[in-house]
Amino acid sequence: MTPEEVVERYSQVISRASHVTYVPIVPSRAENALVWDIEGRAYIDFLADAAVQNVGHNNPRVVEAVKKTADRLLHFTFIYGFPVEPLLLAEKLREIAPLEGAKVAFGLSGSDANDGAIKFARAYTGRRSIIGYLRSYYGSTYGAMSVTGLDFEVRSKVGQLSDVHFIPFPNCYRCPFGKEPGKCRMECVSFLKEKFEGEVHAEGTAALIAEAIQGDAGMVVPPENYFKKLKRILDEHGILLVVDEVQSGLGRTGKWFAIEHFGVEPEIITLAKPLGGGLPISAIVGRGEIMDSLPPLGHAFTMSGNPVASAAALAVIEEIEEKELLKRAQILGERAKRRLEKMKKKHELIGDVRGLGLMLGVDLVKDRETKERAYDEAKKVVWRAYELGLIVAFLQGNVLRIEPPLTIEEEVLDEGLDKLEEAIEDVEEGRVPDEVIEKVQGW
């Protein structure tokens, strides 16, 4: 089969609700930061498979753990039994989590983890209201979709949970209050206070769910003191802080959890994506009394705690520890960010470079003064990068997502950045035709 044939056959049998197209890559095999398609062409993966492959594609430790476990026990549901693998994983997650006395609930995706976090928060507090963030993305299951702050079509078609409210996330490059960095009064914090004085009853609010760094909103990093100020308000009213670490967790930002950069202790953390190293597994990690607030089977799935996926996840954490990947993410992140800042000085298309560790965003603009989003140009950059052998995507229509594996070799990182700059230059110089715009869907 050719890549074109595969793409066409996808359109015949795969629901469009399950897929979004950037480029027609048809993977055949992968190793660390490299992916080969079915025609043998190699690509550098600057997405880490949508932030899944923190320890690299087909990490040998993870593959070995999967093989050894699968040889003796593919599955035994821990709803009725006590397989050892999810126990060992839960104990390890409790050890690394930045909260005291944690207990764990397992699932299959970041979406169901965030759904579960909402259930636990409501059960523990006896309250109904949930606060989410505009432009946030928490998943596609019903509860996660309901607290997602993206203005996307699905909610208008299927409805959403009641008692969900939204506030703006602090974005110092595109401030929702029209302020400039260093010249504001933290209106992003006072907005929550005003919300409680108006349409939202604070004492009826169970939780606020936040990404420590907004990922699909365009890699938005809040001011350093934002979460401390926010947490004080939440604590005053007995409102839980739920932190979605699905994309930012497990070393991506240079710490186990991105919230650790901001000096607060949440009540609940959700994990998925990189946790299984490529296998489907999620985890809700929360204070013990919160995690015991639902009755038996209140958040249970037949396949959750799967022994093979749990063994893979434990191997991921061990790899991060033994290879010192937290430190490596910091070092490589600084290296990549320096290079991207140099690109910004040369290329007017780049309006902003931001992020922590290897969770980086490059905001493409038509005009640096107006900050008008460069939607078509972003599509062209992604397509041209693909032609050059680099896998990259955009968020919010114009922010390039730079999230390679934490294990990427320095020379491969540099080569990928070279390809990215070449793609940007080709777009600026008009060497990428307009017809590619229709080929790239994105979101």
Curated annotation (Swiss-Prot):
Protein's job: Amino acid racemase that shows relatively high activity toward leucine, which is the preferred substrate, and methionine. Also exhibits lower levels of activity toward phenylalanine and alanine, and trace activities toward isoleucine and valine.
SUPFAM superfamilies the record matches: PLP-dependent transferases (SSF53383)
Subunit structure: Homotetramer.
Positions carrying N6-(pyridoxal phosphate)lysine: 273
Transmembrane spans: none
Temperature sensitivity of activity: Optimum temperature is 70 degrees Celsius for D-leucine to L-leucine reaction. Optimum temperature is 75 degrees Celsius for L-leucine to D-leucine reaction.
Record keywords: Isomerase, Pyridoxal phosphate
Metal-binding recorded as keyword: no
Protein name according to UniProt: Leucine/methionine racemase
Gene3D superfamilies in the cross-refs: Aspartate Aminotransferase, domain 1 (3.90.1150.10), Type I PLP-dependent aspartate aminotransferase-like (Major domain) (3.40.640.10)
Source organism: Thermococcus kodakarensis (strain ATCC BAA-918 / JCM 12380 / KOD1)
Cofactor requirements of the protein: pyridoxal 5'-phosphate
Regulation: Activity is completely abolished in the presence of hydroxylamine, a known specific pyridoxal-phosphate inhibitor.
Enzyme Commission numbers on file: 5.1.1.-, 5.1.1.2
Family label: Belongs to the class-III pyridoxal-phosphate-dependent aminotransferase family.
